[in-house]
């Protein structure tokens, strides 16, 4: 199966070498030839933000099994939703669009650096995502 042909807005189990977990649940909301944005759902069926991945790191996608159906039922039963991604201006990559959206909407981002196992959480200081005002678990900026 070609991953880019997986249906949009259907609960999936995604396996990628670019995430710390063994797998994640979510719905693909945007994609192009190289990138994908996933509306992530935790194992309790709750909205868990957006996740950006590149297709090259994804090695398996499951959908329409009893696991994904259970997550979908929980998601609906808990009246969960993901805020619609409205990109103010179209950039050349989904990553740039997502960072620009997070900056404009003042969303907290978590950025993982796979090559160093480092993670940074905070608010973007600019739309390019090159500067982040880090926050702690209480959302205090430091």
What are these regions (language model features)?
Residues 125, 130, 134-142:
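Short, intrinsically disordered, charge-balanced linker/junction segments flanking boundaries
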Residues 27-29, 34, 39-44:
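N-terminal beta-strand/beta-hairpin edge segment
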Residues 22-30, 120-127:
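Short beta-strand-centered aromatic/proline hotspots
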Residues 1-23, 41-119, 138-142:
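Short glycine-rich, low-complexity segments
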Residues 27, 37, 54-57, 123:
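Residues located in well-ordered beta-strands
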Residues 31-36, 63-67, 127-132:
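Short, conserved beta-turn/loop elements at beta-strand boundaries and strand-helix junctions
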């Amino acid at each position: 199966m070609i991953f880019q042909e997986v249906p949009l807005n259907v609960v999936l189990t995604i396996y990628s070498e670019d995430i710390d977990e063994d797998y994640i649940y979510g719905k693909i909301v945007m994609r192009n030839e190289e990138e994908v944005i996933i509306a992530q759902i935790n194992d309790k069926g709750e909205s868990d933000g957006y996740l950006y991945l590149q297709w090259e790191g994804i090695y398996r996608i499951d959908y329409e099994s009893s696991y994904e159906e259970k997550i979908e039922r929980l998601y609906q039963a808990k009246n969960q939703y993901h805020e619609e991604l409205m990109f103010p201006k179209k950039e050349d990559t989904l990553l740039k669009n997502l960072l620009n959206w997070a900056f404009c909407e003042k969303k907290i981002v978590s950025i993982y650096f796979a090559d160093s196992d480092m993670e940074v959480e905070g608010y973007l200081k600019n739309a390019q995502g090159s500067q982040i005002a880090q926050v702690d678990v209480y959302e205090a900026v430091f």
